[in-house]
Amino acid sequence: MTTTPKPGLVDRRNSGSHKDMDVFTFMDSAAALYPYFEACARMGRGTAERPASETFEALRPLGCEAEGEMLEATGGVNTHKGAVFSVGIVCAALGRLDRALWADAARVLAEVSAMTAGLTEKDFADVTAENAATTGQKLYAEYGITGVRGQVEAGLPAVLNIGLPTLEAGLAKGYDFDRAGGGALLAILAGSTDTNIIARSSRARQQALAEELKALLTETPYPDRDALAALDDRFMAENLSPGGSADLLALTYLLHFITTEGNNDE
């Protein structure tokens, strides 16, 4: 949330392409969701001896309750629905594992994959172009895009292979979290399919934007504040908001801090 500037997203600079929320809305939402994420970790610990899929199924009622808490805290604004799903799963995966394993991001995300195996097929089994109702269902029916379900089922490759190494390489260069995190966000956006961008524009625009960002990052892997602010202005002009990539950035931060703490404990 506080990484700034984040093109098209709520941050300390502005509300991005969102007229119904600001950084304080996000703070209210995050505070309301803290008990949920703790409950997810506890659920993971309590079901650690059972099949991973059972932990995931046990999370779903908690997630529904958390969405209600979020909406109550924000006056009906959806700030963190994606994070309720993805961050909740990662917290439960951490709960299932011995603390000594937290230093290994790949192991944590392998547990995420085990928990959600078969999720995409199960949730989209009966989806067709005719009956697709949600944005996710429509994108799956038209393009075969699996969105966040596909990401978690695959062990969040956009986090493990893109976000985390980009963030940590930037920090190693001496950049602060604004610049290293901004670079990680753009790398995720360039290297994965952000369904929020498609929903606010088109598949063609999302693909073109990804290619544009790949070219930018080849030349400047960590754009400075002015460059990020210019991108922010462009995204707002087009009403673009990479919300899916923002959730993946949040997971990148979570795993960075968890794995760093785990390695420091050794």
What are these regions (language model features)?
Residues 68-81, 173, 233-242:
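A short glycine/serine-rich beta->alpha loop
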Residues 5, 13, 60, 73, ...:
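Generic detector of intrinsically disordered, low-complexity, polar/charged segments
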Residues 237, 241-266:
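Short, amphipathic C-terminal "tail helix"
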Residues 83, 87, 113, 250-251:
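Hydrophobic faces of alpha-helical transmembrane segments in multi-pass integral membrane proteins
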